[in-house]
Amino acid sequence: MSRIGKMPIRLADQAQVEVKENMINVTGPKGALSQALVDEVIVSVADGAVTVQRKDDSKRARAMHGLYRMLVSNMVEGVTKGFTRKLEMSGVGYRAELKGNLLALTLGYSHMIYFQPPAEIKIEVPDPTTVLVSGIDKALVGQIAAKIRSFRKPEPYRGKGIKYEGEVIRRKEGKAAGK
């Protein structure tokens, strides 16, 4: 039995889970999410908890068991609390600003980079070197944060670029001067 898959998911008071055929719908105060289910797993709701079970013991069913348990868990957490990724910029002149819903980034290129997030993602800029990406879908929040980070990844010599909060950049030593 999957160690992760066998754990029940406790539902918060505000979250409601509905299972219909091969779809699971989770609704909460922050919004609603739905996920298609594969044939190898069975999702059931009882006593304020969601359980995920597998139909057989095939290798694929075992893999899907843990995966779908975490997907449902992330959906429940997303519609109740939400998810946030914090990006930090370091480098001379590197800054971000919000123009309406458009994120404008100055990253040392000859031009500014404009990024339009999807409607379900909220972007905040508390200060010019910090960007907060938040939403109810964990995968989408991570994907958008990775997209913003990809505009100027941290470089190993000076550490300039966009990095996640708490990310450790492996630094390299520059070329040694001649003898």
From Swiss-Prot:
SUPFAM superfamilies, A to Z: Ribosomal protein L6
Q: Name one GO cellular component term.
A: cytosolic large ribosomal subunit
GO MF term set: rRNA binding; structural constituent of ribosome
Which keywords does this chain's UniProt record carry?
A: Ribonucleoprotein, Ribosomal protein, RNA-binding, rRNA-binding
Q: Does the keyword Transmembrane helix apply?
A: no
Might you name a Gene Ontology BP term for this protein? cytoplasmic translation
Q: InterPro entries from the entry?
A: Ribosomal_uL6-like, Ribosomal_uL6-like_a/b-dom_sf, Ribosomal_uL6_a/b-dom, Ribosomal_uL6_bac-type
Which Pfam family, giving just one, matches this sequence?
Answer: Ribosomal_L6
Family affiliation? Belongs to the universal ribosomal protein uL6 family.
Q: Which HAMAP family match?
A: Ribosomal_uL6_B
Assembly with partners or alone: Part of the 50S ribosomal subunit.
Function text: This protein binds to the 23S rRNA, and is important in its secondary structure. It is located near the subunit interface in the base of the L7/L12 stalk, and near the tRNA binding site of the peptidyltransferase center.
Name by which UniProt lists this protein: Large ribosomal subunit protein uL6
> Taxonomy-wise, where does this protein's organism fall, top ranks first?
Bacteria, Pseudomonadati, Chlorobiota, Chlorobiia, Chlorobiales
